[in-house]
From Swiss-Prot:
Localisation per UniProt entry: Cytoplasm
Biased composition annotated in UniProt, kind: Low complexity: 90-105
Highest taxon of the lineage: Eukaryota
Chain spans, region Disordered: 1-199, 309-375
Keyword Lipid metabolism: no
Quaternary assembly: Interacts with KIN14B, CDKA-1, CKS1 and CKS2.
Keywords: Cell cycle, Cell division, Coiled coil, Cytoplasm
Function as written in the Swiss-Prot or TrEMBL entry: Might be involved in division plane determination.
UniProt protein name: KIN14B-interacting protein At4g14310
GO BP, sorted A to Z: cell division
Amino acid sequence: MSASTNRRRLKDINTGAGENPSSGKKPLRSVTPLPISSKNSNPALQKSLSSKENPNPKLSHRSFGSTQKPVLRPVPRIDKSAVSGEGRVTRSTSSGLRGRSSSPSDLIRVFSDLRKRNESRVIGEKGESGQDKKSGLKSSGFKQGTSEIKVEPSSVCEKADEGSSCPVNSSKFEGSSVARNSISDPKAHALVGSGEKSTVALKSDSKIEKTGKGTSVALRRKSLDNVGKAMEMSKDIRGNEGSSNSTAKYPSKLHEKLAFLEGKVKKIASDIKKTKDMLDLNNPDSSKVIISDIHQKITGIEKSMSHVIDGPEKNKTTKAKSSVKGLNKEELEDRLLPHQRLLRSRTQSKTSSHVSKGHDSVESNKAVNAEEKPSAPVEENAIALEFLASLDKEKVTFMSDQNALENLEVQEMDTEEPSKENDVSKDVNLTSNLTEILRANEALEEIDDEENREEMELEEIDDGCMYQLNDIGSKTSTGGWFVSEGEAVILAHDDGSCSYYDVANSEFMVNECNSLSIWVRLYEVTGVFGFVHYVKSVYSPPDGISPNTWRDCWVVRAPGADGCSGRYVVAASAGNTLESGFCSWDFYTKDIKALHIEDGSSRVSRTALAPLPNNTSHGRNTPACAVVPETQQWWYRPCGPLIASTGSFQSIVKVFDIRDGEQIMKWGVQNPVSALDYSSPLQWRNRGKLVIAETEAISVWDVNSLHPEAQHTISSSGRKISAFHINNTDAEVGGGVRQRVSSLDAEGNDGVFCTSDSINILDFRNPSGIGAKIPKLGVNAQCVSSRGDSVFLGCTNQKSTVKKQMASSSQVQQFSIRKQRLVSTYSLPDSNSHPHHSAITQVWGNSNFVMATSGMGLFVFDTAKEETLQQQPLTSDYGSVQTVREIIGPNDMYCPSFDYSGCRVLLISRDRPALWRYLL
């Protein structure tokens, strides 16, 4: 036929085609051509018709006769760039026909391009006549937008009389086949593509046609039946798609369950890994040491059970032995490592639950697996299959250890029963194994008894260690106090250096690092227990300093040269020394900031001083702080950036700057400074006021005043001052007994001083300076401290009367400022030592404890409660008598002092290292 005839017919068809009723939607792509008659023998025409898209639905009603020539449909334009770049055909946004090509050459070029790129190739396989043939559609160039089964809601046409086509897009129709040339078969639903994408077009006349390379197959059904079946099929596919697209991913339920099991296995593996990491983090070296000890203890069990594996049932007895040994180890772990045992049990329970679920699912699907095998490869589920195969192979059950025979049995699937001879040998082996197991249990019981005894001993040791005195360092300490809320200690040493120890952190490190084992080994070697302390800072002594120069030390806060707050360590003389002076270090850099040595201090005779520092034995056997009368003493007291200095029997008071050692001011007092035995005559009321104890008066000086004169002078009525204490509201915070006093506690109670017949409460608001005067009878005051309403007086009883047995030679008396009388007496045990050795050198008390120290040790009392004071009758001289609660430290201490903060007590003796312990 001529080209003009073809153009005319195509034009007529285009003019009569009309608009597509579904022009508002983007047409679904279909590679299935219009059905053509099998009588048509023109291969070129068949090829051209197989490449068309958007066929005219009205031509589906036209009957094809033998004399009728085939009709060419208009070919849509194809975007070559899209074909070459992405393998997709650019489709029209309208379902209507856009017309034919501009020329036959364009049509030929389109066909050649499609042929070259294999963009829509339909392969059909021919078989023998009379047999069914398998067919598939291969679309390598045209890719679907999705890889799952998709059936559009508009894919089935419900109105058959309109004659519109209803395409159905489908992909991955696996596991099914279509019988070709069987028109009457109503069960042919889809085309098998072997995992590749295919397209099925369901039309109103129930024609499903598939065109191959030169062959065509027509599957015909009745309209109503096919439309109903198509709708049912679309609903089924949509339902399967809503349930996680399991049909698209897995060809059968077995594959779906295997994939589910694989996910469970991976989750279990990840949980095990996380648990292992957690155990590694919670398994320090100490746990390894404990585990190694357990391993050594069960070595005897392993040796006794080693010959079990030599029998004919080697594998079974080995597994049983491991279970028995593991059972014993679990018992040990339950007692020694409960946290690790808990984590392991939780992990095993999760694993067993997942395994049981997976095994049940496999057994339920054995019949399906035997009859039906998946068409797709299952290499991706190899882990799950291997895991399930191992479960099907054998099932091992371990019974309780009540019956040893059951504990040695291993149940295997699909195995033959053993012979009678094997049964006889098995009974013999089981009998011997049972004997060994019983012996192992006896050995374990002995081990448990030994460990229980060790635990009881360790508990006793732990309790004793809590209340044991512990040395701090190895240097002899001449003074020291708690700082930083009792967590650290500042010490002054006999060599002129100072050290800063972090007591709290040192004991924590020991407790965390196998403290019990360290204490046990230390006890085996030395016979004593103790804490290991680590010095944080050491402040080196200045050059040329004499031994035993420092007897007191502080940590002081003061603004630096740059205006920022700084910290300084200050050490100074206190009482009798060969040399007198002070030294300050920067707390952080440890550099010496100031050093001052008194010029005339070296002229003091040695005979008036304490024993030489190197003669330790002499110092322990002599009276505590034996002071020769009328011996000059030097005292230093800091407050903020200033430190005051004076000497007994002198009338000069100097003030220095601790940051550079420069002298700030110099005063002259009216009376010489008093020589006190156990109290400093130089004390601060706050940063602006300095209080000095003179021989017959108390003077108050203002360091901020331009006129060097006393602001207030309080007379002692001609009596000698024996003890002196001032409440400092600007003292350092975080300390112990020398911690600053609150303004509320110091209101009306600026301090206290004692004379031979009375206790005088200082109140600088009164013109006389004395707020209250409490008489004291028959005692010689040695030291005093004040806190709130209470005044604690350390004294020696010199009264010898019939009531002498009611009071010891040394005692602590508690007075009430509000009641202005004696409320309680705390008696120290009687001693035959020298009076100076048994004299109380320091006293302090609060609402819980009353403490007093002498050469006999530190004596701790429970503070008398208000209820107790009301119930007990008061004697005229001593009030309620309280007995000592406990004595801390040795009885040969030299010039002792103490400090208390929180739950720790610090004890200083100037002939040995500092001591501390808990006090609860």
